[in-house]
Amino acid sequence: MLVLGIESSCDETGLALYDTEAGLLAHALHSQIAMHREYGGVVPELASRDHIRRVLPLLQQVLDDAGRTRADIDAIAYTQGPGLAGALLVGASVANALGFALGVPMIGVHHLEGHLLSPLLTSAPPPFPFVALLVSGGHTQLMEVKGIGDYKLLGETLDDAAGEAFDKTAKLLGLGYPGGPEVSRLAEFGNPGAFELPRPMLHSGNLDFSFAGLKTAVLTQTRKLSNACEQDRANLARAFVDAIVDVLAAKSFAALKQTGDKRLVVAGGVGANRQLRERLNEMGKRRKVEVFYPDLAFCTDNGAMIAFAGAMRLKAAPELARHGYDYGVTPRWDLADIRLPEARTS
């Protein structure tokens, strides 16, 4: 089965072709970072318009790269949510129009399920079950994953996501957009221990997160350093990254202890952070835990993860396929709501 995947939930337009027998055949991505940089963040209206411009050329690109035609497509998966409503509607409209024209089934995919399953696209995918740390600009969650569509929420952020805290800290330090990579790069030059920042909820006794207080602590320090030199900024960036990594790592391994699992999957844009990967790998070796990541190309939003997640869902539950023309989207969508029928009764 050849599945076309379409991702348009925020500021990346991603398309991919995934074959259930041959694997990933082609993927293409257009990022809107340059367009949004002058505004310091994503402008929803501009994002939607750019998706409209990019989606059909990218479709033709992946078909050409894979040596296939539209007639070869057996099913279409698209990001149904969560995300920006206008951006989601672009991908959903194209998916449904193309599916209607070709007479093939369609399936709406949860954006976070795409991230959750993206490490399975690697050459050495993790077997089930595992604990997943989903960490991005909009979400920070710990999930226990027993199989496709069988996910249990263990903990989540009560306020800001880790990626949002990175972006806000970047602005406070006068760095560019997107903030996460800029903060991480600056932190490379910082001295550990130069600033003391809190580790929110590190000893809370549960698996939830909170990063709003850490962001406020960074704001307080920047006000004290109104005439900060570059080294001061680097030191503060280092303190911030160390605090984030401490909390994410500690909670992840607490989740593994709680579930008894021995495999940790890290997904989402913040999962590409070098400092976080180094800490998790180090702790994994000490505690005999395998740690898995998606390829760096698939840490950010992409069509490959949507094509793959859609293919796995259609394989596990063919009755989920939709026919006809129905391009509803779900800008706010709880991952717990997408459990497969057999997972609900198990």
Curated annotation (Swiss-Prot):
For binding Fe cation, which residues are annotated in this chain's numbering? H111, H115, D301
A single GO cellular-component term on record: cytoplasm
> What is the top EC class of this enzyme, as a single word?
transferase
Question: Which UniProt keywords are present, listed alphabetically?
Answer: Acyltransferase, Cytoplasm, Iron, Metal-binding, Transferase, tRNA processing
Q: What is its main location?
A: cytoplasm
From the broadest rank down, the organism's phylogenetic lineage runs: Bacteria, Pseudomonadati, Pseudomonadota, Betaproteobacteria, Burkholderiales
Q: Care to name a GO molecular-function term for this sequence?
A: iron ion binding
Tell me where it resides: Cytoplasm
The record's cofactor note says: Binds 1 Fe(2+) ion per subunit.
Q: Which cofactor(s) are needed, names only?
A: Fe(2+)
Function of the molecule: Required for the formation of a threonylcarbamoyl group on adenosine at position 37 (t(6)A37) in tRNAs that read codons beginning with adenine. Is involved in the transfer of the threonylcarbamoyl moiety of threonylcarbamoyl-AMP (TC-AMP) to the N6 group of A37, together with TsaE and TsaB. TsaD likely plays a direct catalytic role in this reaction.
Q: Which organism is it from?
A: Cupriavidus metallidurans (strain ATCC 43123 / DSM 2839 / NBRC 102507 / CH34) (Ralstonia metallidurans)
Name the catalysed reactions. Answer: L-threonylcarbamoyladenylate + adenosine(37) in tRNA = N(6)-L-threonylcarbamoyladenosine(37) in tRNA + AMP + H(+)
A biological process from GO: tRNA threonylcarbamoyladenosine modification
Q: Which is a Pfam family this sequence falls into?
A: TsaD
Which InterPro entries does the annotation name?
ATPase_NBD, Gcp-like_dom, KAE1/TsaD, TsaD
Q: Which family is it part of?
A: Belongs to the KAE1 / TsaD family.
Per the UniProt record, which EC number(s) apply here? 2.3.1.234
Name by which UniProt lists this protein: tRNA N6-adenosine threonylcarbamoyltransferase
Q: Record's Gene3D superfamilies?
A: 3.30.420.40
Highest taxon, organism lineage: Bacteria
| Annotated substrate binding sites | L134, V135, S136, G137, G138, D167, G180, N273
